[in-house]
Amino acid sequence: MDAIKKKMQAMKIEKENALDKSEQLENKLKEIEDVKVKIEEDLTSLQKKYTNQENEYDKVNEQFNESTVKLEASEKRVTECEDEIKGFTRRIQLLEDELERTQQKAEEAVLKLEEASKAADESERGRKVLESRSIADDDRIDKLEKDVKDSKYLAEEADRKYDEAARKLAITEVDLERAETRLEAAESKITELSEELQVVGNNCKALQNAVDQASQREDSYEETIRDLTQRLKDAENRAAEAERVVNKLQKEVDRLEDELLQEKEKYKQISDELDQTFAELAGM
């Protein structure tokens, strides 16, 4: 009987020890699971931060590309404006040359008209002198008459040339007015283009400043990205280490779970033995 009591007492103590060890194992398992969850949360947070930095870098790079395209378009527009200004300058020079030639032709026509008028006046004076002297020489009279006719013809031709010159001069004046109008329009266009060129230049400077700032931001972001990349590598190393620790802990958990299962089976076996012992005692 004493042996049975001692055995029951030993089994009771062993049962209590098994319960304590089981509780300790469960607490240790819970702590390990909490550490595992914390490590997984840190890893998720690091991956999210890295993704956000990648998106920010893509956005800055896209803004830099847009600024480059705008700068190239502005430079192209400036070149086009400079070409237009050169074209207007050449046209103005051609108009001025044409006006100078027209004025020179008009002066030559007026000079020829004056010479023809002088010749006609001289012939008329000669005819009057011949008439006053009553020269009876028909040949000379015929010649003089012919000279007079020629002089009249020259005078008429001079008048015609004068009229033609006057008409051309009028046309030239109209062309000159048109040229002056076109010149004024060209000067206005040049002024407008100069203002536009100045605006474009200011825009180019602003774009260049924006590009410089974007470049500085890009350098800053590149430095940040390098830092984040290093931090990500460190995080990945820590994550790998954490995964290694988790795997190790998982193995420990599996071992503890197996040990817990064995303890539970052992506890069940002890409980069954106690039940059997109590049954034997009750049967006695």
Swiss-Prot record:
Keywords: Allergen, Coiled coil, Muscle protein, Repeat. GO terms for molecular function: protein homodimerization activity. Pfam families: Tropomyosin. Disulfide bonds: none annotated. Residues 1-280 form a coiled coil. GO terms for biological process: regulation of muscle contraction. Gene3D superfamilies: 1.20.5.170, 1.20.5.340. Tropomyosin, in association with the troponin complex, plays a central role in the calcium dependent regulation of muscle contraction. Homodimer. Belongs to the tropomyosin family. The molecule is in a coiled coil structure that is formed by 2 polypeptide chains. The sequence exhibits a prominent seven-residues periodicity. This is Tropomyosin.
